[in-house]
Amino acid sequence: MRAVVQRVISSKVEVDGKVIGSIGKGLNVLLGISKEDTEEDIKYLKEKIINLRIFEDENEKLNKSLLDIGGDIIIVSQFTLYGDCRKGRRPSFIEALGGEEAYILYNKFVESIKKEVNNVATGEFGADMKVYIENDGPVTILLDSKKTF
């Protein structure tokens, strides 16, 4: 399971011109799910994301987590995080989990976050979305539950 985690001032997702999810200060998470992912990957990434100390304290040091600041989170599914561009010019998505299986793991991830964070918004799984991100910093962190980077 992979995530691109961005510290944001605000973020929103539109589908067919309608806002379906929006947040204020917090994290925008683009989430990719692989064929190898399990509930253990969900647990690892959830704990890592909600406890990442990427918000500034009173001394402007990155010492506070999403939980510490009571921030919001928006989670957007993005299978392209498993795009393999090592061969040729067209990404291969063979490692990305698709369809119903990915939808189930995505929802389990979202539900695990909802148990910890008050304001959780999402995109629409499988939809063509417009994602608006007002970065703060910018601070962008790449996470992989298999620890490949």
Curated annotation (Swiss-Prot):
A motif (Gly-cisPro motif, important for rejection of L-amino acids) lies at residues 137-138. Belongs to the DTD family. Its EC number is 3.1.1.96. CDD domains: Dtyr_deacylase. Homodimer. InterPro entries: Daa-tRNA_deacyls_DTD, DTD-like_sf. Keywords: Cytoplasm, Hydrolase, RNA-binding, tRNA-binding. One of its GO terms (molecular function) is Gly-tRNA(Ala) deacylase activity. Pfam families: Tyr_Deacylase (PF02580). This is D-aminoacyl-tRNA deacylase.
